Amino acid sequence: MKKLLLLLLFVPLVSFGQVKNGEHNTYYESGELKVTVNYVDGVKQGLEKLFYYSGELKSTANYVDGLAQGEWKSFYYSGELRYTINYVDGLREGEENTYWKSGELVSTVNYVDNFREGEKNAYWKSGELKITVSFVDDLKQGEEKGFHKSGALNYTLNYVDGLTQGESKYYYESGGLKFITNYVDGLRQGEWKYYYESGELESIKNYVDGLRQGEWKYYYESGGLKSITNYVDDVRQGEWKYYYESGELDYTRNYVDGVKQ
């Protein structure tokens, strides 16, 4: 009897200690195949396939001794290629491409030792360039440019070690300046100016360390003052004034710690 009890106690320990070998499949509750992959001595080996609930192929991945290796692919539900990426010893290496369903590129970026390195480009569905920016050690570095669908310049931003830095400019598709901003170490700083498409000044806003600060002014396109507002540490404070386009005072509001009085 004691031997039988010892044997019964030993069996679960053996089963828990087993390592996966061969094909291993997991399924959706409906019974449809979800993942199929091969194991050798408990680690993934070879091709892994993932499937949508409908049975369509979702992605393929390759493993060597448990590490991601070679090309991985992802597919849209309808079957079109979504993206490709290459791995070397578990790290992203080389070009990653993402695609629209039509087959046109959404974006392309290069990896070195799992870090984005070099130029990244993103595209409109039409194939026109949408965004271009460079990476150094996985951080944005230097000038980023954005473009309208027409190809006209949309904006310019500057990055230093992944943080927005200095003056940025945004443009209307017609080419006119839309607004000018300023950043210091990723935070909004100083005077921001916004313009109507006609070129007339629309507003002047002030920031200190990312917070709305001081007097903000808004203008009618005709040039007349529209309103004056005030902030202290990102909170509405003091008297706010609103004007008719004729220049006459329309009404005022007063705020104390963000609460209208």
Residues covered by each model-derived region:
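Periodic aromatic/glycine/histidine/acidic cluster detector
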Residues: 4, 15-244, 248-261
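Repetitive helical segments and hydrophobic/amphipathic motifs
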Residues: 11-12
